[in-house]
Amino acid sequence: MNAVQQPDIAWNRDHLDPGAEQEAVIRGITGEIAGKGFVVANLDRLVNWARTGSLWPMTFGLACCAVEMIHAYMPRWDLDRFGIIPRNSPRQSDVMIVAGTLTNKMAPALRKVYDQMPEPRWVISMGSCANGGGYYHYSYSVVRGCDRIVPVDIYVPGCPPTAEALVYGITQLQKKIRRTGTIFRE
């Protein structure tokens, strides 16, 4: 006798139908794990849940809002506890935080950094200057909102917004990532 033996299978019409075989396997697995406390989830939700716990932002501080963004990383608010660790390279980050006044000269650089980020990527606009031009809205050299250059997911209002507002905006982004069922954003 060989070390490996073929199982004794009685061939019938069910083996010709792949759907019946799949159903039999699913019934067997369901019967095996019933009542044993297994967690069943789809891959998309699992991936999105994992992403929310490890957001790596690219900080794009342009003006006074950047100071409040830095405060969010200090011990009082400590964004590291949320798994949010700032990265120095856009190729390693998945979130961009635009904080401050975006000028016409800086807009191409913002777009270039955004384009270097891997998919999926998200943008948080922090402060009234980044949201809509703010105090400098009518200046000839100011872009009236960074959403004219890059798609924005979360707007954090204020002039300047507090670190607490940024933390709240990040938690809203985490909820949005969990809620959306897409791995790649169109």
From Swiss-Prot:
A GO term for molecular function: 4 iron, 4 sulfur cluster binding
Q: Which biological process, per GO, is one annotated for this protein?
A: electron transport coupled proton transport
Indicate the enzyme's highest-level EC class. translocase
Residue positions annotated to bind [4Fe-4S] cluster are: 64-65, 129, 159
Q: Which Pfam families match?
A: Oxidored_q6
Q: Which UniProt keywords apply?
A: 4Fe-4S, Cell inner membrane, Cell membrane, Iron, Iron-sulfur, Membrane, Metal-binding, NAD, Quinone, Translocase, Transport, Ubiquinone
What are the names of the required cofactors?
[4Fe-4S] cluster
Assembly and binders: NDH-1 is composed of 14 different subunits. Subunits NuoB, C, D, E, F, and G constitute the peripheral sector of the complex.
State what this protein does: NDH-1 shuttles electrons from NADH, via FMN and iron-sulfur (Fe-S) centers, to quinones in the respiratory chain. Couples the redox reaction to proton translocation (for every two electrons transferred, four hydrogen ions are translocated across the cytoplasmic membrane), and thus conserves the redox energy in a proton gradient.
Q: What does the similarity note say?
A: Belongs to the complex I 20 kDa subunit family.
| Name of this protein | NADH-quinone oxidoreductase subunit B 1
